Amino acid sequence: MEAAITQRIQYPSWVDCRKVECKPQRGSLRYSQQVKVDRRFRGLSLARLQPERRNDQRRAVSPAVSCSDNNSSALLETGSVYPFDEDILKRKAEEVKPYLNGRSMYLVGMMGSGKTTVGKLMSKVLGYTFFDCDTLIEQAMNGTSVAEIFVHHGENFFRGKETDALKKLSSRYQVVVSTGGGAVIRPINWKYMHKGISIWLDVPLEALAHRIAAVGTDSRPLLHDESGDAYSVAFKRLSAIWDERGEAYTNANARVSLENIAAKRGYKNVSDLTPTEIAIEAFEQVLSFLEKEETMEIPDGDL
């Protein structure tokens, strides 16, 4: 389940884009050798394209966090973002879209990892339709919240509804789906998700615990019945959940590590990342997966 988390981040308005010339990228032929050639000449890497930020121009981060009641998304409200990053996101979507051939994408990850927010961004720039599994389940239950479903019907009942939702979505094309944190524990769910491309948002447990502690655990049915301070409760339970699910997340076709993105961009904390930056990396990882997939499918004699 995803709780709607709001993280307000202030950004400097100055960006010197005169040093960088950006041209829209176009999809190339779907042949592995051609892909390799195209990739060689796509210009500067994502990291090198970023305008240099001096220490005194680093974004100021406010810990202000709010939570909605419907648990349908982990929404990081970022306000304005760098137009430069928005351009990169659009260009990456244009680059990936021809290779997708209409295949859908499924975002997986721990609760609070931002699947809904990132998924909405990706679907928008691709022109795909977005669905949140938890929201679909709540609608099927006449508006009953996920937390209430757990209380009145139990987790197994909810997991069954989750599988039903994924089964229906798997027959559709050109959709981006935000799954619940526990969707990965049922092998049948992977069968449905692998009809598209699965993307794992890998967020450090400490960061997740801080997010959840800031909004409280009342809306998290799997974090109930614990005593202690909010962060300790969240981190302890998240660690236990990770022990149960961690290996299952590795079944995803693409992994988006927030720690890796932060390191590449010179941030000290993953909380400095914007959803746009995460979505850009997601497209990069999807493209990498698709290129490897093509190479495996094409006989050596055709290379």
UniProtKB/Swiss-Prot annotation:
Its EC number is 2.7.1.71. Mg(2+) binds at T116. GO terms for biological process: amino acid biosynthetic process; aromatic amino acid family biosynthetic process; chorismate biosynthetic process. InterPro entries: P-loop_NTPase, Shikimate/glucono_kinase, Shikimate_kinase/TSH1, Shikimate_kinase_CS. It comes from the Eukaryota. Binds 1 Mg(2+) ion per subunit. PROSITE patterns: SHIKIMATE_KINASE (PS01128). Gene3D superfamilies: P-loop containing nucleotide triphosphate hydrolases (3.40.50.300). Disruption phenotype: No visible phenotype under normal growth conditions. Keywords: Amino-acid biosynthesis, Aromatic amino acid biosynthesis, ATP-binding, Chloroplast, Disulfide bond, Kinase, Magnesium, Metal-binding, Nucleotide-binding, Plastid, Stress response, Transferase, Transit peptide. It catalyses: shikimate + ATP = 3-phosphoshikimate + ADP + H(+). SK1 forms a homodimer in solution, which may facilitate its relative thermostability when exposed at 37 degrees Celsius. Belongs to the shikimate kinase family. Catalyzes the specific phosphorylation of the 3-hydroxyl group of shikimic acid using ATP as a cosubstrate. This is Shikimate kinase 1, chloroplastic. It comes from Arabidopsis thaliana (Mouse-ear cress).
